[in-house]
């Protein structure tokens, strides 16, 4: 499943789950349709994207479950605590997101607790993340909150985007993940 976040009126969209390896080409086609637009107005909505991914309806069957979230961002994230201020600012600029997820964590610590399995839910929604099969892969800069997440959260790998110089570097990382997971 691919959640996608943008600024402005169309803040959120998501794909269906892709079953690997059977739907590999469908996933590739979907990824080719995603584009980056605008930018330069850090921070962005990366934490919301991560929270939505964590609330996905992950498969619960099978002996070896892997619930893998891969997040790409080139910017710091808005703190959850700034939500009210940000929505008021967006309204002043004439933006009213047509789709914005409900029940976001109240702060970063609530998100951390759900990831670590210390609580079954945030905002009264149950997560189906497998406590031993969850994996978080971050392609993110050395900015809030990504640098800390790479250290603080279990089963998490972070790659600094400034160290990635080409598509070949990402392909190498993905090949490593494919064999490691």
Segments the model singles out, each with a brief description of its role:
Residues 38-42, 114-117, 162:
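Short amphipathic alpha-helical molecular recognition features
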Residues 25, 62-68, 95-96, 129-136, ...:
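Loop/turn elements at helix/coil->beta-strand transitions in domains of secreted/extracellular proteins
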Residues 151-181:
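C-terminal "exit" segments of structured domains
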Residues 7-68, 76-78:
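Von Willebrand factor
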Residues 75-152:
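VWA/integrin I-like adhesion module and closely mimicked acidic/polar interface patches used
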Residues 45, 141-144, 165:
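Short beta->alpha linker loops
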Residues 1-4, 67-74, 137-140:
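Extended hydrophobic secondary-structure segments that form protein cores and membrane-embedded regions
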Residues 26-30, 49, 89, 107, ...:
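Alpha-helical scaffold elements adjacent to nucleotide-binding pockets in ATP/GTP-utilizing enzyme cores
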